[in-house]
């Protein structure tokens, strides 16, 4: 196994341990035992428990950032509504394809420490700004109802986070496409005019 595969192996097992036990209860000994590597091997790749936890969260942030594509009202192949649904679908899929990391992101990472809280807040603020700008653009095109785009962005993120929290934490059995349809319907009954 090469170094990148070994690193990925440790990350995957650490994610599983964090998802099962929570950050504070997770121990490096359990991570290395689950990964089948020596403790020294862990430290070749990661400084400490926090470093591996932070990398897991950072990778999820990156995947989410790549999942969202700017809506193009001039796209002749995909309607605005289809593009919006595609973005919702991409976000939902990214978070539900890895429920362990989503659990970590929505529950275990919150309140870890002030520096990590700032990192999470920064991610949510950046997501909110991107969504807010998309909503302002949509308002200019008549695709989004007039109103406070900042509030709309917070409400939208809150709805998505709560839906995924319920699915991941409570084990509610909702098909991804049903979640996409319901979220799109919710937005369509509110500010969306697509």
Each predicted region: which residue ranges?
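Helix-turn-helix
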Residues: 9, 17-51, 55
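Short secondary-structure transition hinges
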Residues: 93-130, 140-143, 169, 173
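C-terminal peripheral helix-coil segments that are non-catalytic and often amphipathic
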Residues: 89-97, 129-140, 159, 166, ...
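Amphipathic alpha-helical packing segments from all-alpha helical-bundle domains
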Residues: 62-69, 114-140, 150-154, 162, ...
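Generic hydrophobic, amphipathic alpha-helix propensity
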Residues: 6-14, 31, 52, 56-67, ...
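Hydrophobic alpha-helical connector segments
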Residues: 55, 69-97, 152-156, 177-180
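N-terminal intrinsically disordered/low-complexity leader segments
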Residues: 1-5, 194
